[in-house]
Amino acid sequence: GMLSSSAIIECVVEAMKKHGIQQLVVDPVMVAKSGDSLLREDAVDCLRTRLLPLAAVVTPNIPEAEALTGTKIVSDADVRRAAKSIVAMGARSVVVKGGHREGPATDLFYDGSDYREFTAPRFDTVNTHGTGCTFASAVAAGLAKGLATEEAVGQAKEFVTEAIRRSFPIGQGHGPLNHFYKLWK
C-alpha cells in the first residue's frame, strides 16, 4: 500500500520485526495514474533500504519498478534488469507487473535465480480499479495458505485475470474488479 513517508515506513518495519513476519508482500504504491509521485524522496530511499529487505515478494507495476530502480523500462530485457535490481535490494522475490505495457498482460516473476512469465489476455474493459492491490492481497493469501511463492503468484494472476474478465460495468470511469466471480456464475 501507500506508505508516503519514511516515518510511516519505519513504523511498518519495526512492526514486521517485532512480530516476526516472514511472508511480507510489499505492493509499493508510489506513482499515481497521472504519473505524479506519491512518496517523498526520503520515503523512496527508506522503502528500498529498510522495507524491501524484509519482503518475501515485491509487486511493482512498471512505473513503480522504474521509481525503485531509477531506470526506464521499455523492453523485456529492461523488465528483467529491474527485477534483478529489486531482488538485489534484499527482497526474496519480485513480480514486475506488465499491465502498463502493450500486448498481453505479462508479469515477470524473479526469485534471485529463475525468471518466470505469467501471461494472461488483455480485456477491453475499464473495470481495472484496484488490480494491483487485489494481486498483492491474493499473493499474500496464497502464502498464508502455505503455497510456495511462485505458486501463490500463479494463483493470484489467475484470480485477478478472472476478476477483470467477469467485472461489471458500474458507474462512470474505472470500475472495480469482480472479486466475487466464483460466487456468481
Task: Locate predicted features.
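Conserved phosphate/ATP/ADP-binding segment of small-molecule kinases
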Residues: 41-115
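Phosphate-handling active-site elements
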Residues: 115-116, 142-156
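Short beta-strands and strand-loop turn motifs
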Residues: 25-33, 59-68, 136
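Short pre-catalytic strand/loop immediately N-terminal to key active-site residues, enriched for Gly-Thr
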Residues: 115-129
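Glycine/small-residue-rich loop that forms an oxyanion/phosphate-binding "nest" at active or ligand-binding sites
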Residues: 1-53
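Nucleotide and nucleotide-moiety/phosphate-recognizing core
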Residues: 11-13, 17-19, 23, 106, ...
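Charged C-terminal helix
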Residues: 150-185
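Short, small-residue alpha-helix embedded
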Residues: 67, 126-149
